[in-house]
Amino acid sequence: MSVRAVRRAVMLVLVPAALLSQGSTPALDFSGVLFGNFQYRTDSAARAATAGQPGDRFDLGRAYLNFRLPAGDRGAVRVTTDVYQQTGTAAAYYAGWAIRLKYGYFQYELTRDLAGVQGLAAAARIGMLQTVIVEHEETFWPRWMGNSPTEFNGFFSSADVGLSALITLPNRYGEVYTTMVNGPGYSSGENDRYKDFAGRVSITPFGRDSGFLRTLTVTPWYSVGALASQFVLGGPGQVGPVSQGLEKNRRGVFLGIRDRRLTGGLELAQRLETVESGLNTAASPRLTSDVTRDLVSGFAFVRPLEIFDPKRRSPFSVFGRHDRFDNANVVGARNILTWFGALWDVNARMTFSIDYQELKAENPPVVPPTNTTVPTRSMFLHWVVNY
């Protein structure tokens, strides 16, 4: 056999194998977000830690790394790592930046024509996934500047471990999202036997239009859950273990719009909880009370030059946000967040903001409980890069 014939035979074997290898390699979709800030604090708490002088520091907020891969027929996997600085007890061992999992779930596309309705799609997820409302809010409020209203005020963590279902409505009319999760959030493991069940319906009534109201979204949502009693195991001197769960419900409605000229949101929400007091002993019996805490939040981002001239793309915008959240301990006491500033787009993927943030207690109790809000006043230089 000639050398040319041998070479031809080898090529006939290797080329199909190479093509098969290329065809069987799944496509990796990688993206990321990196953001941080410089902050200058002038409140009394900051001055107390610096001998009466204002405090300042550079901070790296987060580095999110997103990996998306197909996983078989109709299947896909998303893994998002969260690079953050250690705090709390973990900082005693290592106070630097660490990596943890933010999202890690498998998604299976059930159908694109649910119940025979064309365009009515359904998918299911399992793993560490989005909670009911936070990521939806973050399509209107930029996470790199700070937490969304519900996450900032302790309603939810942004991710948790469990199951979820997503139904996409036809003709761009919105979606339905439901979850069953552990409850503590992605930064903690499960700590009791209870689960949180939640759902939202996001309606875009003008989704098929091409005008300003195309992204207007109305989202009612509800979450039902419970917490274990602090006396679930009983103990020395107690009258016995407490097996009943404590109410941990949340509900609200979010209204949002997303356009280059104006992006904003308005949220009305409630935290409904059962709290315990006493020591669960004969001398100090366990008592429970139901507490409802109201949240009213609104924010807006405006590009004033584009409002006056829609054909002109401007890198400059201004924003403001105001949160009012009830204090659980005293009637009439509230935590007030005031936030405003200006943003500048360096390019299509990087943005800076200069903003002022103040958190204060309105009508604080005369004898503060341990969870009373510590007033803060800060100037920030925020920055974000998407890649």
Protein language model regions, located:
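Outer-membrane beta-barrel proteins
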Residues: 41-45, 88-91, 133-138, 187-189, ...
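Extracellular loop and loop/strand-boundary signature of outer-membrane beta-barrel proteins
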Residues: 48-53, 84, 88-94, 148-151, ...
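Detector for outer-membrane/organellar transmembrane beta-barrel domains
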Residues: 194, 202-204, 210-328, 336, ...
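C-terminal structured "cap/appendage" subdomains that terminate the fold
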Residues: 336-350
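Juxtamembrane/transmembrane-helix boundary motifs at the membrane-water interface
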Residues: 41-50, 336
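Predominantly the C-terminal beta-signal and adjacent terminal strand-loop region
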Residues: 347-387
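Outer membrane beta-barrel
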Residues: 23-42, 52-186, 191-198, 202-212, ...
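Cleavable N-terminal export/targeting peptides
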Residues: 1-24
